[in-house]
Amino acid sequence: MDKTITFKIDGVDVKGFPGQTIMEAADAAGVYIPRLCYLKDLTPHGSCRVCTIKVDGRAQAACTQPIAEGVEVENNTAELNEKRRDIIDMFFVEGNHFCMFCEKSGNCELQAMAYRLGICAPKYPFQFPDCSLDATHPDLFIDRNRCILCGRCVNASKVIDEKSVFEFVGRGAAKKIAVNADTLAGTNMAVSD
């Protein structure tokens, strides 16, 4: 049987197993760490930074940081929650995220995270970027005004259904999600996939 590893999250002992990340061990122990890009069955990449914690005083992404014996993890602190609010706030002002007009209102992780962190109105000015829409595939439509570039669709499409439907294109401010039309040509891809 594998040796258990004991560490602390906000002063509480948490046990995990070698190879687990702090996020996985926290979930197993019932300790909530905020996240947006993390999905349980996918390799984490820490792109959203909402799960940022402090491990022995150093900022780390909980979804990618492996557990280690005796480390002290800070999660639910005023400083970290303020940074999380800033990140979520920026997601809202950089895109077309007007919850009361959205069909996903009430069933949206971004909206739920904002409420959980106490965000009632953005503190930054809206940017209203003019993001293009992608309707290059007959069964898929990407509204880039709502995309926060978390990468979940890209990773899920590669790992879970192995179709590589979506991909990142561009770099920096020009980075966006695109439908890999060449890969989909002649496939039986359907909206239900």
Report residues per predicted region.
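Terminal leader/tail segments of proteins
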Residues: 1-4
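N-terminal cofactor/phosphate-binding cores enriched in small/glycine residues
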Residues: 7-69
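Fe-S ferredoxin-like electron-transfer domains
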Residues: 49-193
